[in-house]
Amino acid sequence: MEKLTILLLVAAVLMSTHAMFQGGGEKSRKAINFSETRKLARNKQKRCDGWSTYCHDDSECCSETCANSYCTLIKGVRTTSHPI
């Protein structure tokens, strides 16, 4: 009778442990899907050009200022000379 009781206790512990890990696996899968979704969203964002890059329009530059066909270093600053 003691062996049966011990066997039932071990079975109960194993089943509860299995259920606990199964539930945690679902949460981690959701967390992974969430992080993948965020990463994909960041990759889809429009990239901007850095300072001294040739441009046609303000929206192409990170500083949002295209002056004399080059992106400026500081937002809103329009220089009259070409960058280095």
Swiss-Prot record:
The modification 6'-bromotryptophan is found at W51. Residues 1-19 form the signal peptide. Its main location: secreted. The keyword Secreted applies. Gamma-conotoxins may act on voltage-gated non-specific cation pacemaker channels (HCN). Keywords: Bromination, Cleavage on pair of basic residues, Disulfide bond, Gamma-carboxyglutamic acid, Ion channel impairing toxin, Knottin, Secreted, Signal, Toxin. Expressed by the venom duct. The modification 4-carboxyglutamate is found at E60, E64. It is found in: Secreted. The lineage of its organism: Eukaryota, Metazoa, Spiralia, Lophotrochozoa, Mollusca. The keyword Secreted applies. Coiled coil: none annotated. Disulfide bonds join C48-C62, C55-C66, C61-C71. InterPro entries: Conotoxin. Three forms of this peptides have been described. The unmodified Am6.1a (Am3286) is not detected in the venom; Am6.1b (Am3408) is only Trp brominated, while Am6.1c (Am3452) is both Trp brominated and Glu gamma-carboxyglutamated. Both Am6.1b and Am6.1c are detected in the venom. This is Conotoxin Am6.1. One of its GO terms (molecular function) is toxin activity. It comes from the Eukaryota. The cysteine framework is VI/VII (C-C-CC-C-C). The presence of a 'disulfide through disulfide knot' structurally defines this protein as a knottin. Residues 20-47, 78-84 form a propeptide. Belongs to the conotoxin O2 family.
